[in-house]
């Protein structure tokens, strides 16, 4: 049975990936900061699907903890076939109003962790001739909206570039770019009422999102943008004049996942 390592696996999109991959008979390595919560998730998945579930508590903004996760990906005796880089970090304030230390921590999680873990996972996959790298990015990466958007733009470009580099190896790389998703992400940013952020039609279901992404992975697609509404929106954003794109980026009462 294949093994998938998922970061940010205790809730939201990461949990949806864990459930979907367990249902597809993947053993799991679940990574998040909250070990107690991970243990509960692991117990439920073992009982429901009969798969092995390993828990690895780690704060990916901490370089020592990140290296422990990278070591797990490199372990030749316990190969990982699927890497899902999903760990998130919300930024509450605009760049000029915020704390640079918080911005740096966000980049450690959203950029450096993706870089380090992908570099640890991909070479063993290539050596075995199969595997998949999935990076959870965001449609925010197509906007001009501060450090979070810039980090997601990097994640998308990095992963799509990696897909080209991996062509012919049997290993795929896919950047998942969701819009607004019904998870705990916005509640953690202090936004309890989702209607303040976006209308009801804009919100996506995490389980459906993951199912669509895994279908794109199986097709070898480098970019997965769920739902027609977001595919149309991102196409428009990429082709509008810069002045208009900047105006859209300034209007940010909340962010897509």
Task: Spell out what each predicted region is.
Residues 10-11:
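Conserved glycine-rich cofactor-binding loop
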Residues 24-40:
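Conserved glycine-rich Rossmann-like NAD(P)H-binding loop of the short-chain dehydrogenase/reductase
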Residues 94-96, 102-107:
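Substrate-binding pocket helix/loop in short-chain dehydrogenase/reductase
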Residues 118, 151-154:
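Active-site helix of classical SDR
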Residues 118-119, 160:
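A short, exposed helix-loop element centered on a Lys and neighboring polar residues
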Residues 138:
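Residue(s) in the substrate-gating loop at a strand-loop-helix junction
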Residues 175, 196-233:
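C-terminal helical subdomain
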